[in-house]
């Protein structure tokens, strides 16, 4: 077993003491997860299925308990040994909880319930709280999926305005370059898979492995041959054109796409003299599309200038919407890309008369790493407990920050059948609104069993159906 695989130690230290802190007579608890606002006013839900399969799919064992007991005693925390041993002996080590969640891929306005966790055994009412640490990590894939989804809406808008084939172009317009800039292999896999909810382009191989293992998708994303600086500069400055010619020799075939970073020395000279003059006829004869990648400078200015220079060399066609589409070549910008700079680039080239077909984008750290739990203000809170047989509301309402006010009661998420709009509601309200709304939450996990799974294809369909 891996040294991090003990579920009992996949929590915050203080959680080990919480079973002693509830009111006498407590025998059930109810928790929920929401985005309390943030950078974006909608979130694309994704990643819970993977977290559940990774973190709680294995029953708790007495060996786990022995390990946790020894470590927590040395660490300075009390430990509910009797409670955990009862779960192993009486329940076979399966966690007595029910988890309900919005279907993965659904895009839900912030300030709404996204998932709930409730106890199913009176003696183990404290288990949902113990799992907060690992379950709230869903903030990460949800936030990455949300950033990626928001970018997709930006790109879709410009494609619809300037392209003859917006839906055909869209899936490969944002490429994941983030594997090397993320905090861990696991984060690369989970965050990379979250991006693949919205796009098909990625260089994060671990994301393909996660999608294959957890979302029933043999190959979730695609890439193309591409140069890096070392494969160009190793030829030497004087042989730069030979490095580019080698890329054509190795990869340029009819219908193929090959990307070549071209700013190792002078991006503008590379386009004018090498790509646009010396190699021009070779590119045309190859039948391939060569994608030039600038990797420095101001992204907005550099992309526009590259398009202008490539247009001088290769010319363009004017599409049905009156925008220019370059012949034989494209540009991909992967340096300095975030939702704001991406929009600025598209605004600039649109104003210059170029279709969004001409450019693609890569995002690395801004996609997988420059996010945190506060990007969308994620929280997992207790909203109800049952004490002496009666449910009571549980909530916080700090006078120093009204934004941290939590919801109260046993909750769910309703979706209006006519408008598709979501709103959080009490479970008791579901029957009242049965005529006009559906309960949007689905039981995905109960008492050690995964009850509902989504394929990545289904997740993508949910996300693609939503709009800003």
UniProtKB/Swiss-Prot annotation:
Chain positions recorded as diphosphate binding sites:
180, 229, 293
Give the record's GO biological process terms: NAD biosynthetic process
Similarity comment: Belongs to the NAPRTase family.
Q: Which residues carry this modification: Phosphohistidine?
A: 229
This enzyme's EC code(s): 2.4.2.12
Report the outcome of residue 175 to F: Blocks the tunnel, results in a 403-fold decrease in catalytic efficiency with nicotinamide and shows a weaker binding affinity for the inhibitor FK866
The protein's matches in InterPro entries, at most eight in alphabetical order, are given as: Aldolase_TIM, DUF5598, N/Namide_PRibTrfase, Nicotinamide_PRibTrfase, Nicotinate_pribotase-like_C
| Post-translational modifications reported in the UniProt record | Phosphorylation at His-229 plays a crucial role in enhancing the substrate affinity and is important for maintaining enzymatic activity.
> Mind telling me what this protein is named?
Nicotinamide phosphoribosyltransferase
Q: What happens when the gene is disrupted?
A: The deletion mutant is able to grow in the minimal medium MMX, similar to the wild-type strain. The XC_0719-XC_1067/nadE double deletion mutant is only able to grow in MMX supplemented with NAD(+), but not in MMX alone.
Task performed by this protein: Catalyzes the condensation of nicotinamide with 5-phosphoribosyl-1-pyrophosphate to yield nicotinamide mononucleotide, an intermediate in the biosynthesis of NAD. Plays an important role in the biosynthesis of NAD via the nicotinamide (NAM) salvage pathway. Is also capable of hydrolyzing ATP and shows ATP-dependent autophosphorylation activity.
For this protein, the record's Gene3D superfamilies field holds: Aldolase class I
Q: So where does beta-nicotinamide D-ribonucleotide get bound?
A: 203, 335, 373
List the pathway annotation: Cofactor biosynthesis; NAD(+) biosynthesis; nicotinamide D-ribonucleotide from 5-phospho-alpha-D-ribose 1-diphosphate and nicotinamide: step 1/1
Keyword flag Nucleotide-binding: no
Q: What class of enzyme is it?
A: transferase
Q: A single GO molecular function, which one?
A: nicotinamide phosphoribosyltransferase activity
Impact upon substituting residue 229 to A: Retains some level of ATPase activity but it completely loses the ability to produce nicotinamide mononucleotide from nicotinamide
Question: Which catalysed reactions does the entry list for this protein?
Answer: beta-nicotinamide D-ribonucleotide + diphosphate = 5-phospho-alpha-D-ribose 1-diphosphate + nicotinamide + H(+)
């Amino acid at each position: 077993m891996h040294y991090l695989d003990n579920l009992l130690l996949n929590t915050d230290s203080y959680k080990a003491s919480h079973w002693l802190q509830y009111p006498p007579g407590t025998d059930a608890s109810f928790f929920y997860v929401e985005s309390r606002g943030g950078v974006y006013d909608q979130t694309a839900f994704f990643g819970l299925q993977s977290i559940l399969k990774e973190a709680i799919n294995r029953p708790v064992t007495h060996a786990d308990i022995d390990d946790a007991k020894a470590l927590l005693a040395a660490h300075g925390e009390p430990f509910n040994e009797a409670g955990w041993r009862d779960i192993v002996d009486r329940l076979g080590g399966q966690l007595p909880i029910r988890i309900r969640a919005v279907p993965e891929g659904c895009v839900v306005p912030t300030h709404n319930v996204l998932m709930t966790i409730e106890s199913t055994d009176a003696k183990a009412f404290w288990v949902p709280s113990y799992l907060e640490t690992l379950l709230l990590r869903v903030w990460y894939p949800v936030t990455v999926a949300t950033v990626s989804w928001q970018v997709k809406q930006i790109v879709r808008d410009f494609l619809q305005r300037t392209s003859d084939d917006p839906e055909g172009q869209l899936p490969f317009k944002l490429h994941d370059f983030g594997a090397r800039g993320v905090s861990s292999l696991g984060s690369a896999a989970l965050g990379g898979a979250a991006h693949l909810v919205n796009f098909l382009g990625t260089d994060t191989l671990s994301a393909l492995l996660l999608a294959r293992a957890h979302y029933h998708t043999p190959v979730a994303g695609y890439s193309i041959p591409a140069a890096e600086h070392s494969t160009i500069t190793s030829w030497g400055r004087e042989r730069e054109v030979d490095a580019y010619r080698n890329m054509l020799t190795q990869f340029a075939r009819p219908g193929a796409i090959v990307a070549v970073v071209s700013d190792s020395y002078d991006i503008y000279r590379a386009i004018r003299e090498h790509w646009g003059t010396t190699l021009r006829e070779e590119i045309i004869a190859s039948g391939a599309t060569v994608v030039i990648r600038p990797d420095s400078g101001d992204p907005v200015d550099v992309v526009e200038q590259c398009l202008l220079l490539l247009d001088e060399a290769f010319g363009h066609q004017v599409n049905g919407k009156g925008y220019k589409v370059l012949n034989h070549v494209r540009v991909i910008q992967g340096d300095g890309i975030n939702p704001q700079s991406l929009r600025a680039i598209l605004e600039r080239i649109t104003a210059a008369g170029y279709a969004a077909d001409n450019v693609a984008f890569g995002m690395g750290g801004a996609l997988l790493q420059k996010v945190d739990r506060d990007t969308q203000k994620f929280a997992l809170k207790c909203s109800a407990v049952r004490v002496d047989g009666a449910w009571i509301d549980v909530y916080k309402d700090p006078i120093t920050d009204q934004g941290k006010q939590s919801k109260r009661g046993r909750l769910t998420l309703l979706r209006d059948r006519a408008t598709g709009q979501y709103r959080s509601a009490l479970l008791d309200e579901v029957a009242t609104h049965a005529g006009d709304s559906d309960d949007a939450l689905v039981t995905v996990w109960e008492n050690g069993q995964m009850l509902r799974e989504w394929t990545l294809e289904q997740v993508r369909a949910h996300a693609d159906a939503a709009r800003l």
